[in-house]
Amino acid sequence: MDLPAPIHDILLVSLGSGLIVGGLGVVLLTNPIYSAFSSGLVLVCISLFYIPSNSYFVAAAQLLIYVGAINVLILFAVMFMNGSEYYNSFHFWTIGDGFTSVVCTSIFFSLIATIPNTSWYGIIWTTRSNQIIEQDLTSNVQQIGIHLSTDFYLPFELISIILLVSLVGAIAMARRE
């Protein structure tokens, strides 16, 4: 990423400060769930450090593996702990729940409207003299990204939603016992 020097410096300072704040949150917060979310902030900031050095695949892999898998497992383990002392003042529906449900519902309906109307094959195919040809100069990493963002995009997202629903269901069942 060829950024001007001041923007590059601001980006690095903001990522570093996010890393420090997240690390302090992991250590200083008494609620283990908040501490796990702070570790997620730390992992996101670490993965974003790779972007200014043009290591996009490493950044994406770090986000998928550490934030998407490891941090979810940490949150899953924290949810199994006996957290009754943290939830003494349980409210059934709060303002934050309403705001979150409105945001999630609007994102869901915008995705439902956008996905069928998007030409996914138009992302990678180029047109030259009325022939549609695939770009020949792609590496294996680019081919993986191309196939994940075109051919396997919808199955990839459906699997992630199924895994998320099963995780939430397992947490809900473990909470009842």
Curated annotation (Swiss-Prot):
Keywords: Chloroplast, Membrane, NAD, NADP, Plastid, Plastoquinone, Quinone, Thylakoid, Translocase, Transmembrane, Transmembrane helix, Transport
EC numbers for this chain: 7.1.1.-
GO cellular component annotations of the record: chloroplast thylakoid membrane
Pfam families: Oxidored_q3
Domain of life: Eukaryota
Single annotated GO MF: NADH dehydrogenase (ubiquinone) activity
Reactions the enzyme catalyzes: a plastoquinone + NADH + (n+1) H(+)(in) = a plastoquinol + NAD(+) + n H(+)(out); a plastoquinone + NADPH + (n+1) H(+)(in) = a plastoquinol + NADP(+) + n H(+)(out)
UniProt similarity note: Belongs to the complex I subunit 6 family.
Protein name (record): NAD(P)H-quinone oxidoreductase subunit 6, chloroplastic
